[in-house]
């Protein structure tokens, strides 16, 4: 199992932009081998994230015998599986915890100028979806697949003030405490 090392981790390969305004990042490439009678067959699995810079984000996995084909399959799947997350001034609405498998991710909104304080796969997600200020911590498993899924589960679970106001039958101002 080969992890992406050094300068290439989380970088976009040149020529990946399709002109549709989406940002693409490769999170991990895994080399796998299948042992057969005649020797070993190499294969590659790629994990990528795609975002529109305005709260839209998707993750994709691709497998192939060659790296570029695996990455392309992953990018295509990520485009198909995009979700929309409502942001508040370039950060989250409220603190949230996401879980998937043994991975647990804690994400908290941060004040302007903080930047993205998050590790590895989480950083790639926040960069492509347009989050500029956030504090995030990965607890438990740091497997990139599980961390990405846990992050997306947490982001999907986050609710905005309009949803909460509709549930409670109140106005958004009452929920935010702006009305006296």
From Swiss-Prot:
Pfam families: Ribosomal_S5 (PF00333), Ribosomal_S5_C (PF03719). One of its GO terms (molecular function) is rRNA binding. Disulfide bonds: none annotated. Keywords: Ribonucleoprotein, Ribosomal protein, RNA-binding, rRNA-binding. The keyword rRNA-binding applies. Residues 1-20 are annotated as: Disordered. SUPFAM superfamilies: dsRNA-binding domain-like (SSF54768), Ribosomal protein S5 domain 2-like (SSF54211). The keyword NADP does not apply. GO terms for cellular component: small ribosomal subunit. Residues 22-85 form the S5 DRBM domain. GO terms for biological process: translation. Gene3D superfamilies: 3.30.160.20, 3.30.230.10. The N-terminal domain interacts with the head of the 30S subunit; the C-terminal domain interacts with the body and contacts protein S4. The interaction surface between S4 and S5 is involved in control of translational fidelity. Part of the 30S ribosomal subunit. Contacts proteins S4 and S8. Belongs to the universal ribosomal protein uS5 family. With S4 and S12 plays an important role in translational accuracy. This is Small ribosomal subunit protein uS5. It comes from Nitrosospira multiformis (strain ATCC 25196 / NCIMB 11849 / C 71). The lineage of its organism: Bacteria, Pseudomonadati, Pseudomonadota, Betaproteobacteria, Nitrosomonadales.
